[in-house]
Amino acid sequence: MKALLRQVAEGKDLTEAQAEAAMTLMMTGEATPAQVAAFLMALRIKGETVAEITGAARVMRERAIRIHHSRPLVVDTCGTGGDGSHTFNISTTAAFVVAGAGVAVAKHGNRAATSLTGSADVLEALGIHLDLTPEEVGRCIDEVGIGFLYAPALHTSMKHVAPVRREIGLRNIFNLLGPLTNPAMAQAQLMGVYDPNLTEPLARVLGNLGVKHALVVHGTDGVDEISISAPTVVSEMRDGFVHTYRVVPEDVGLSRAPREYIRGGTKEENARITESVLSGEPGPRRDVVLLNAAAALLAADRVRTLREGVELAAQSIDSGEARRVLERMREFTHRLRAESA
């Protein structure tokens, strides 16, 4: 570990294999807390490369508890968070819309870190039990069309690194790795990021990891989603090739709205917003969910364009299918807990 730490501290990039070696030492507890902290900060100051992120993500994926399912394709809508915008849980709400449109979702997520409410927090407030076994999560994906992959329960090797991350309190490579390490091996992904300079590199990383089609996005108003209030930078990766462009709501027939209209609050408030959107309430909250669900449907190759995706997402809500997915997930997790009681 000392040799790898010295190399990074000197501003020299690691190869993918070296990044894998460093990550393995950290995930197995062989690296000391001081070495982990120094490595993470040296890497942050130098700037993480595509090869370094790819190598680290490979190790984290390999060491995760795998979620097995029988769906031919699953999509994830997990983002980095950390944008400080305090929006409601847009990608989590969009996940129900995507599932309502017939595309299976393996939603990877966690509790809030820098925001008020993480995906795990809002799902609990919606009455969904999260303490499922890996086998039960796979069944939920198969039977309901959506499953929640609670990161701390599935990335148990993180126990060696988590205390150091908390003590540092600064962004580091692990802020990027969560959305890159879906334990159900999602082949399609919508990934929001907190920095526009990350869209293209992380799209390339997803291609390196075997994801077939992904959209990595950053709203220029600062949100780690496709924005309803400003242009969004989109790096679309399909079969390893990356194309970067900009999207505005008007491109898909939607109107812009101030970012204040999509602000969230406590987990209870955000749960109410999710339920209202899934129940068909019109307005900017619905529109931003339509936009992001459309991107996930495009990544899953369910539609050919974002505009088609918006139309299909609207059908998912207006037909009641998106709401029924939420209700089925709630009932499924309650039934499992009752059976195990």
From Swiss-Prot:
Keywords: Amino-acid biosynthesis, Aromatic amino acid biosynthesis, Glycosyltransferase, Magnesium, Metal-binding, Transferase, Tryptophan biosynthesis. Anthranilate 1 binds at G79, N110. InterPro entries: Anthranilate_Pribosyl_Tfrase (IPR005940), Glycosyl_Trfase_fam3 (IPR000312), Glycosyl_Trfase_fam3_N_dom (IPR017459), Glycosyl_Trfase_fam3_N_dom_sf (IPR036320), Nuc_phospho_transferase (IPR035902). It is an enzyme of class 2 (transferase). It catalyses: N-(5-phospho-beta-D-ribosyl)anthranilate + diphosphate = 5-phospho-alpha-D-ribose 1-diphosphate + anthranilate. Pathway: Amino-acid biosynthesis; L-tryptophan biosynthesis; L-tryptophan from chorismate: step 2/5. Its EC number is 2.4.2.18. Binds 2 magnesium ions per monomer. 5-phospho-alpha-D-ribose 1-diphosphate binds at residues 79, 82-83, 87, 89-92, 107-115, 119. Gene3D superfamilies: Nucleoside phosphorylase/phosphoribosyltransferase catalytic domain, Transferase, Pyrimidine Nucleoside Phosphorylase, Chain C. Mg(2+) 2 binds at D224, E225. One of its GO terms (biological process) is L-tryptophan biosynthetic process. Catalyzes the transfer of the phosphoribosyl group of 5-phosphorylribose-1-pyrophosphate (PRPP) to anthranilate to yield N-(5'-phosphoribosyl)-anthranilate (PRA). Homodimer. This is Anthranilate phosphoribosyltransferase. The gene is trpD.
